[in-house]
């Protein structure tokens, strides 16, 4: 008995490990795993179904087919455990060893492992420094390779064809050694001296200067070093022994009818064994070389197919013409081992059903059909039945449950009480897609869901299904209750706004109840309180909308958090007074004293949560829902065809538009406008007409005229049902009402261009056939887009999760002083996002001072909550430096202070929170709401793009930044700098508006001057770019020779002549080297210097420039010397929506990126080549100039002799994020990506907190390239993990040595995921083969730091509740203790014993 218990204990021991290492397997290692050699290709005997001896399923090698029973049946039962039968050679043990015992095949000739050969870059090729083509020719017996040159003129590794080999044999005899096949490659690999080769390459690296050569050398050095360090031997990449997978992992199952279903691997192994045996026989017979060679090649191909079918040549197909699934196919792809079984497992104790509404449920409840509950909670019911003594055995209990006896239902009630279940709706796009509820038993077969959680699940009741899961263990139940309960998930983790918000009916009900109406029944009464209001309403003495005075008692929290009552008489309506009864104490009456729309209700819940906390909010939310449903039913709001009131003006608006279109058509026919202009104008006319119709319609719907108490007419907001639905935010929008009662407007063709004949009808009037046909385009495109969108959005989320999965909060404070400056987002005249929204929930990086003083307003390291933000607003602070994850100094993970507030909970984030996954989900989840298309700008939009002035909206003072300007003759400022910004500051010092001012703009007001709202402050010519002089004097032409560098043109209409500079391509040979320029001289003819420098004022003119001055004219500063016509870029496509977000996160270079200045200095142009010009920037301090070739067609923003700063734009275009990082730093690139991504989401009205995007950016910046190795052991130009450089530098500096210098790299999310330190995580993401090959060669260790790796190896993840377990293990490891072993109690042991004995009895009781 005792040793049985010991045996059981050994069975339950869990493996504790800290890291997983992957390496090449040596032949001896493969043999040590093996339990015997597989010699025959046979599988099982088709008559007896017993495995053949020495075959692929041999019981002697792999273990018994039945538990504790040998093959011939001599030994049965547990007592013979461990005996090896002398007759059949099978060990008596459990069958499950057939899942773990491996075999092997001794190959008669070595074969190359295809992964190390063909997975690019080829490892064997890199190691031998031979091209892959040559190696393949040797391996597949087409050429010879020289292994030892001896005293001959043949080089080692030289490739010889058959003829060359024979010639060499004749010439040198056996002086040299050349072979073909894998033996040759193996010999080459064996004879390599890795250390010496490494030394040699390092020396070469120091001597060489060519960039490509350096890259190649570093690659080889890295590979060789990896081999040296990992202890892998190169010749192990050639297989001499092939391992055989355990048979139960490649099963063979008999189907009825004498056929077998088998895993493809068996076929592949059979081919290998057959060819191997044939090759052995041929070698024993000493067959002719050519036959042996052919057989060897076939063996090589068979092994290739087994390891990775289809990688080389055609894939081997089975009987049914489809390629066989090889070992590589087993692990890669969506159906492979990683994604199908390790990352996505199926679970027991779950059910699914359709969902319906449960309007009477509380927020933490869900309705569970009795049938489902009975099935899901079976084990608990069996247990209870036995415990009560109502059933003696499990079998009896089972029978009772099947009969559904009365007592079973009582027990079910008991079991279910306080036992939460998880509800999940696919697709689970964010963590709120799985929440816990307490089940309430219901009749029927549909799960009932609380209406308020629909928003989080994105569920509706048109046939959606949901899955139920039962948390079994106590810990699981505890987590479900404490963390996943729907009542604990009130706020969205993406933006910190409430996600439990009413929608549709509830909103309509509350809106209806809080509206007021002129002269309603009971207007003007004075009531004692909400109770009386309700009584009057119920008894029909007062209308719900009557304006009355009511005595209201409000409660307000004082400084100590006590509630203080305050009673006053309020002007309000009956409905609002009734609603006040459900509002929790502590909120002001003003929040219900308004017509409540969806936004107002959301704000009300948010306020409630911030002031009163979780519990009152949950109760309040439920009450809101019940009240809303009640009054929505009372309102009787419905949609009738007469609610869609068509405006009378519609006909005349349309006929006016038609007349204008006809007029333009005439102009087009008489040749006054071009076809494109006509099209754009027509579309503009119809768009304007549509707007007018919809405005007339909305004015019509919005108000109605009523008679008030005094008998006068008064306008009030309409009670039209459709209008109320749209106005409250319950359903529908102005655009949809426009289609119902206005006109449908312009439609797009399938290719996205707009059809110029609009649909003038609306749905109430009905469409004719043509109109209906046109409108089908749009509908069809919508459906197609949605399908594409879902797939793309899902893939984006997967990439985001993958790149961010290992980012966890690991410490409280990293102590950094770095951070990013937060300012409000202002585009033109509107504040898109106020500062408050951007800094709320962040931690300050430095003290915030009161503007204009040195007094500290907010100290450093303060978490900015609502009250702090109010303080910032009161003092009109305009910029705050906050901590950010991008600048966090924690090595693995981030610190809580750099992250700030946990948006879903409202306090600073806890340690162990998986912020990476939360960020990825928050960005990915709204992905399906983004559009898929690229926007074409045409018509009205493209004309608006060419702005030519700035008109301010508000009054205030002007502030210019980065400005250089000169005053012109009329006393106005002319801008001569490139990236000038004009800001409007209000009287409190806050920025209200911000505009970009181009070069050459004329300002009406100067810096610091006051302007009134609506005033124009700057204007410029959008079509030409001027050349402005900064000094006054006389113009002197240099190199301006008519016919060579310039030509004179006269305008027919005005008769004015102007000079046009010829492009270098148009010039004659003599004019090629001339540089046309305008020089400014004083009256004496001496050069005038540019103020502040010693350079003469000389303006070089580029080709196509137009000069309207004559030689020797007097000019004054600020005048235009020449104009350069700007080719307007035509209609540019703007990539929007999802593709744009993907481009940003993948850090793709745009097609024609902006050219930025690499260094600061003076611009000049060097010698031109055919299609390019040479830009030279000479630094002022006299160091080496920087040169760059720029295509001629790029329009440059700089003139010769101008001074630029590093990172300035030289030629416009979309900026490449890599350039921003290189030239302007980490913070600039963070700001760029965050702002660009936010622009896309903001357009769709989706709110995402900046810090989620910053988290992804931090992961994109994980790598750094070593610039100078210092005394570290990195290679120059090597790409390493940023944290590793930091740690290494810290150690070096502590020892007083020189650290490595590096430059940060920006990787796209796919690249970053594949470049992670963890090979398990990378392999499960994409390109499994390549990742595993690389890892094996380098002998990588996976420290299992991220979440994905731990899920794959089946451990608790180092986040959330698993964080403590991992911390504990790390502490133990540091202290060197053994991990706490799981204790086996006596009960456990006896239970396991019973199970084991049952197994030994051959399972007589197998129901």
Swiss-Prot record:
It catalyses: RNA(n) + a ribonucleoside 5'-triphosphate = RNA(n+1) + diphosphate. This is DNA-directed RNA polymerase subunit beta'. One of its GO terms (cellular component) is DNA-directed RNA polymerase complex. Pfam families: RNA_pol_Rpb1_1, RNA_pol_Rpb1_2, RNA_pol_Rpb1_3, RNA_pol_Rpb1_4, RNA_pol_Rpb1_5. The gene is rpoC. InterPro entries: DNA-dir_RpoC_beta_prime, DNA-dir_RpoC_beta_prime_bact, RNA_pol_asu, RNA_pol_N, RNA_pol_Rpb1_1, RNA_pol_Rpb1_3, RNA_pol_Rpb1_3_sf, RNA_pol_Rpb1_4. GO terms for biological process: DNA-templated transcription. Belongs to the RNA polymerase beta' chain family. Zn(2+) 1 binds at residues 70, 72, 85, 88. It is an enzyme of class 2 (transferase). It comes from Shigella dysenteriae serotype 1 (strain Sd197). The modification N6-acetyllysine is found at residue 972. Its cofactor is Mg(2+); Zn(2+). Its EC number is 2.7.7.6. Mg(2+) binds at residues 460, 462, 464. The RNAP catalytic core consists of 2 alpha, 1 beta, 1 beta' and 1 omega subunit. When a sigma factor is associated with the core the holoenzyme is formed, which can initiate transcription. It comes from the Bacteria. Zn(2+) 2 binds at residues 814, 888, 895, 898. Keywords: Acetylation, DNA-directed RNA polymerase, Magnesium, Metal-binding, Nucleotidyltransferase, Transcription, Transferase, Zinc. DNA-dependent RNA polymerase catalyzes the transcription of DNA into RNA using the four ribonucleoside triphosphates as substrates. Binds 1 Mg(2+) ion per subunit. Binds 2 Zn(2+) ions per subunit. One of its GO terms (molecular function) is magnesium ion binding.
């Amino acid at each position: 008995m005792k040793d049985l218990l010991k045996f059981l204990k050994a069975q339950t021991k869990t493996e504790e490990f800290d890291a997983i290492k992957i390496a090449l397997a040596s032949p001896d290692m493969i043999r040590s795993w093996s339990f015997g050699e597989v010699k025959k290709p046979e599988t099982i005997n088709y008559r007896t179904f017993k495995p053949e001896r020495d075959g692929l399923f041999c019981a002697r090698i792999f273990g018994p087919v039945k538990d504790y029973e040998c093959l011939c049946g001599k030994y049965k039962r547990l007592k013979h455990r461990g005996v090896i039968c002398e007759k059949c050679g099978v060990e008596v043990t459990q069958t499950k060893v057939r899942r773990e015992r491996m075999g092997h095949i001794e190959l008669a000739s070595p074969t190359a492992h295809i992964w190390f050969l063909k997975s690019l870059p080829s490892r064997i090729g890199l190691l031998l420094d031979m091209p892959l083509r040559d190696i393949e020719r040797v391996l597949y017996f087409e050429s010879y390779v020289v292994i030892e040159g001896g005293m001959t003129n043949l080089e080692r590794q030289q490739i010889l064809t058959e003829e060359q080999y024979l010639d060499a044999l004749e010439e040198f005899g056996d002086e040299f050694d050349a072979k073909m096949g894998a033996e040759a490659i193996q010999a080459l690999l064996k004879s390599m001296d890795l250390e010496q080769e490494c030394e040699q390459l390092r020396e070469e690296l120091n001597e060489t200067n060519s960039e490509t050569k350096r890259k190649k050398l570093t690659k080889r050095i890295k590979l060789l070093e990896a081999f040296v360090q990992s202890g892998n031997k190169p010749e192990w990449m050639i297989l001499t022994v092939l391992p055989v997978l355990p048979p139960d992992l490649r099963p063979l199952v008999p189907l009825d009818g004498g056929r077998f279903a088998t895993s493809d691997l068996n076929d592949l192994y059979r081919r290998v064994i057959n060819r191997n045996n044939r090759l052995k026989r041929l070698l024993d017979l000493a067959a002719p070389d050519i036959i042996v060679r052919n057989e060897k090649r076939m063996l090589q191909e068979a092994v290739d197919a087994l390891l990775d079918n289809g990688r080389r040549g055609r894939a081997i197909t089975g009987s049914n013409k489809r390629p066989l699934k090889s070992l590589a196919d087993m692990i890669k792809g969506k159906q492979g081992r990683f994604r199908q079984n390790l990352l996505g497992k199926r679970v027991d104790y779950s059910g699914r059903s359709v969902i319906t509404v449960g309007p009477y449920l509380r927020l933490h409840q869900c309705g569970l059909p009795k049938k489902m509950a009975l099935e899901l909670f079976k084990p608990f019911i069996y247990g209870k039945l036995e415990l009560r003594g109502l059933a003696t055995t499990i079998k009896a209990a089972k029978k009772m449950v099947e009969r559904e006896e009365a007592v079973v239902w009582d027990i079910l009630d008991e079991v279910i009480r306080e036992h939460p279940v998880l509800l999940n709706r696919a697709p689970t796009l964010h963590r709120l897609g799985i929440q816990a509820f307490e089940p309430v038993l219901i009749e029927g077969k549909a799960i009932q869901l609380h209406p308020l959680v629909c928003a989080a699940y994105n569920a509706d009741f048109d046939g959606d299904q949901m899955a139920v899961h039962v948390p079994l263990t106590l810990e699981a139940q505890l987590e479900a209750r404490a963390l996943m309960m729907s009542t604990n998930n009130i706020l969205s983790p993406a933006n910190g706004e409430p996600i439990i918000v009413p929608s549709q009916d509830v909103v309509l009900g509350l809106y209806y109840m809080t509206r007021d109406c002129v002269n309603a029944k009971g207007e003007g009464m004075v009531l004692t309180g909400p109770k009386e209001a309700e009584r009057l309403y119920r008894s029909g003495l007062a209308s719900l909308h009557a304006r009355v005075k009511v005595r209201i008692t409000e409660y307000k929290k004082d400084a100590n958090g006590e509630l203080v009552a305050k009673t006053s008489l309020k002007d309000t309506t009956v409905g609002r007074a009734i609603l006040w009864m459900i509002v929790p104490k502590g909120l002001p009456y003003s929040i219900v004293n308004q017509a409540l729309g969806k936004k107002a209700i959301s704000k009300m819940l948010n306020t409630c949560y911030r002031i009163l906390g979780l519990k009152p909010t949950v109760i309040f939310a439920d009450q809101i829902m019940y009240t809303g449903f009640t009054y929505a039913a009372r309102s009787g709001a419905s949609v009738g065809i007469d609610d869609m009131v068509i405006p009378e003006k519609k006909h005349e608006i349309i006929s006016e538009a038609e007349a204008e279109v006809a007029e333009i058509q005439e102009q087009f026919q008489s040749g006054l406008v071009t076809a494109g202009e006509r099209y754009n104008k027509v579309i503009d006319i119809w768009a304007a007409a549509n707007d007018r119709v919809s405005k007339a319609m909305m004015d019509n719907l919005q108000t109605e005229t009523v008679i008030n108490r005094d008998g006068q007419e008064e306008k009030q907001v309409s009670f039209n049902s459709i209008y109320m639905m749209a106005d409250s935010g319950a359903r529908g929008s102005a655009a949809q009402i426009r289609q119902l009662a206005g006109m449908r407007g312009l439609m797009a063709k399938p290719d996205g261009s707009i059809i110029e004949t609009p649909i003038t009808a609306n749905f109430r009037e009905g469409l004719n056939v043509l109109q209906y046909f046109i409108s089908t385009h749009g509908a069809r495109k919508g459906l197609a887009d949605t399908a594409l969108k879902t797939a793309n959005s899902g893939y984006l989320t997967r990439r985001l999760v993958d790149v961010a999965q290992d980012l966890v909060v690991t410490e409280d404070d990293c102590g950094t002083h770095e951070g990013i400056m937060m300012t409000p987002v202002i585009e033109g005249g509107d504040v898109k996002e106020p500062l408050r929204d951007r800094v709320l929930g962040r931690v300050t990086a430095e003290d915030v001072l009161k503007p204009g003083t040195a007094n500290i307003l907010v100290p450093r390291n303060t978490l900015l909550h609502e009250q702090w933000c109010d303080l910032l607003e009161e003092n009109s602070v305009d910029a705050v430096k906050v901590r950010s994850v991008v600048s966090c100094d924690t090595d693995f993970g981030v610190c809580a202070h750099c992250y700030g507030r946990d948006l879903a909970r409202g306090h600073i984030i806890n340690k162990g929170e998986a912020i990476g996954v939360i960020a990825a989900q928050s960005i990915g989840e709204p992905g399906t709401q983004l559009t898929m298309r690229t926007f074409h700008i045409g018509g009205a939009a493209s004309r608006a793009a060419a702005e030519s002035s700035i008109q301010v909206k508000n009054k205030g003072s002007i502030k210019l930044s980065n400005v250089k300007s000169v005053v012109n003759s009329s006393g106005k400022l002319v801008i001569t700098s490139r990236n000038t910004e004009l800001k409007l500051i209000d009287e409190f010092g806050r920025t209200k508006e911000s505009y970009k001012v181009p070069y050459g703009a004329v300002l009406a007001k100067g810096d610091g001057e006051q302007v009134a709202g609506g005033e124009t402050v700057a204007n410029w010519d959008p079509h030409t770019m001027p050349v402005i002089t900064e000094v006054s004097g006389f113009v002197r032409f240099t190199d301006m020779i008519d016919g060579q560098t310039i030509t004179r043109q006269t305008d027919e209409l005005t008769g004015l002549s102007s000079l046009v500079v010829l492009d270098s391509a148009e010039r004659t040979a003599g004019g090629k080297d001339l540089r046309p320029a305008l020089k400014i001289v004083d009256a004496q003819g001496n050069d005038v210097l540019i103020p502040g420098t010693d350079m003469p004022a000389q303006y070089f003119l580029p080709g196509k420039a137009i000069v309207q001055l004559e030689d020797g004219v007097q000019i004054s500063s600020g005048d235009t010397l020449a104009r350069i016509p700007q080719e307007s870029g035509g209609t540019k496509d703007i990539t929007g929506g999802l593709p744009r977000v993907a481009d940003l996160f993948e850090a793709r270079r745009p097609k024609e990126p902006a050219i930025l200045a690499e260094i600061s200095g003076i611009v000049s142009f060097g010698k031109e080549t055919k299609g390019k010009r040479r830009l030279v920037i000479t630094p002022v301090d006299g160091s080496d100039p920087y040169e760059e070739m720029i295509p001629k067609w790029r329009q440059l923003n700089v003139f010769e002799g101008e001074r630029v700063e590093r990172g300035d734009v030289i030629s416009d275009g979309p900026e490449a994020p890599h350039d921003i990082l290189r030239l302007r730093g980490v913070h600039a690139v963070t700001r760029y990506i965050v702002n660009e991504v936010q622009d896309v989401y903001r357009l769709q009205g989706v709110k995402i907190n900046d810090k989620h995007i910053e988290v992804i950016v931090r992961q994109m910046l994980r790598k750094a390239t070593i610039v100078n190795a210092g005394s570290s052991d990195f290679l120059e130009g090597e790409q390493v993990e940023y944290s590793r450089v930091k740690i290494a530098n810290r150690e070096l500096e502590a020892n007083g040595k020189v650290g490595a210098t590096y430059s940060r790299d920006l990787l796209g999310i796919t690249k970053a995921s594949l470049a992670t330190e963890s090979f398990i995580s990378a392999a499960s993401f994409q390109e499994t083969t390549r990742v595993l090959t690389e890892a094996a060669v380098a002998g990588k260790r996976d420290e299992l730091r991220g979440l994905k790796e731990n899920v794959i190896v089946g451990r608790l993840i180092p986040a959330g509740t698993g964080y403590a377990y991992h911390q504990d293990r790390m502490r133990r490891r540091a202290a060197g203790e053994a991990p706490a072993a799981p204790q086996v109690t006596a009960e456990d042991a006896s239970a396991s014993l019973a199970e084991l004995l049952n197994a030994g009895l051959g399972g007589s009781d197998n129901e």
